[in-house]
Amino acid sequence: MALSRWGTDAEARELGEGIRDLLRDVLGVTAETGRTFDPAAVSASPSRLSDADVRALAAVVGRGNVSVDDDQRLPRARGKSTPDLLAWRVRPEVDCPDAVVAPRDDDEVAALLDWCGRESVAMVPFGGGTSVVGGLTPDTGGHRAVISLDLAHFTELESIDPVSGEAVLGAGVTGPRAEELLSGHGFSLGHFPQSFPYATLGGFAMTRSSGQNSAGYGRFDEMVRGLTVVTPVGVIEAGRAPASAAGPDLRQWLLGSEGAFGVCTRVRVRIHPVPEAVRYEAFRFPDFATGAAALRAVEQQGAGPTVIRLSDETETMVNLATSTDSIGEQADGAASGGCLCLCLFEGTAEHAASRQDETRAVLLAGGGTSLGPEPAQAWEHGRFGAPVLRDALLDNGALVETLETATDWARLPALREAVTGALTAALEASGTPALVMCHISHVYPTGASLYFTVVAGQRGEDPIEQWMVAKRAASEAIVSAGGTITHHHAVGTDHRPYLEAEIGDVGSRMLRAVKSALDPHGVCNPGTLIP
């Protein structure tokens, strides 16, 4: 990926007239207010490793798998949050990992962790580089240096069990590569988060990722049947049977551990046959509360769509105003002034049709109006494009970021109101109007996630701090309203200050005790996760 944007430079897009008009008329944002990225201004911090250190690392993984070059260290210095991308524009002096090291197998990972402990060098695992919560921050944690441990060699389909419906894949396999490898055997993983084009299976596991098809296939942590994690004190192979009463589930201690306990090198995942059929349908609801109640009914009655998502009035309005494809043509007028709900149904032709009929009946009974298949088809066609649009918005002076949370159905309205209010107030105090949009895209019998997209104008000399003030306000509102600090983005460094409020003092001490037992020298991704 490019340093200062999501994806590659070839994927960069220009803003359409509808978006430019919206930015100007609602937020007072024009291209003249934007900040551009100047590659010539970027400077990497010098490596703190000696020639002897590099030789020692090369003795473990081979000289070709160790680099202290700036062009290798810079891409691993930051993730892809809005503060990360703005930092390339306004903070060009970059704290980089001191080396990039790519082990080839578990033994080399273990040897690297042993060397890190002996030599007081921290380690940050690197998969696709898509963290949006500071998970890649090259924090030394008080050690003399920090390396980026790249999982680029862990990219194989190691085994597949079509009888059990399981496959073992390397932690460095990206989302598209996983689908390619599995489709050759007639299977799919079915995990499609926004980061799908670049993120890796190891990253999905270590951050408890949740994809857009979660209503049908579950979150990624539900797909993981087993995983291998190399820790500084040994290798953990967690997950043996489909269910077990042999004490606490070690998988759950490792899933979501964000590299703080060790390095995930492979996952065993649940797979399913490539769908025979995909059916689409969109609905309009008069307001968000009515739509949310209908989604709750769908989930609690077990109707079973593969994808179901509901945009609030503001997000629906913005999507229609900025659309250049059939979603605008088909839904404009029908969804204007209301909320757009999108559904997909996968499986055999009979099963997909049956679940569509059942879901439609529930949504219509709940106040929905069918808009036909086209809006849902258009959404699927462009569903990975939002980060690319964000790049163009940042270039044109807009401040754009997302955050997410979840709670039970009873508290969902109050949580949405609290977060929307906190974001709006904080950004208006910085001197800009704000568009705060929200959608539901992950539903459970007892509750749902809320995913917020915020668009405002960049103000002042430091738009990063402008956003961080708003993010802190939103995080405090989430905690006060009883939401989780993160539903699927992970903790990283951004959410760590709020974790203890969620898991309590005893929970925090449990995490620190496990960290101490598995990583006694504290070399594994310091500064991340652990309160």
Please place each PLM-identified region on the residue numbering.
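Flexible inter-domain linker/hinge segments
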Residues: 1-55, 112, 208
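C-terminal substrate-recognition/cap domain of FAD-linked oxidoreductases
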Residues: 12-29, 60-88, 279, 284, ...
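Glycine-rich N-terminal segment of FAD-binding domains in flavoprotein oxidoreductases
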Residues: 49-58, 67-152
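Alpha-helix capping/hinge segments and adjacent helical runs
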Residues: 63, 479-491, 516, 520-524
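A glycine- and small-aliphatic-rich helix-loop capping segment at beta-alpha/alpha-beta transitions
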Residues: 83-85, 135-155, 183-187, 211-218, ...
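Conserved phosphate/anionic-ligand binding catalytic regions in large, soluble enzymes, centered on
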Residues: 131-136, 204-205, 250-265, 443-447, ...
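FAD-binding subdomain of flavoenzyme oxidoreductases
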Residues: 155-309, 523
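Activity-critical C-terminal alpha-helical subdomain
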Residues: 495-531
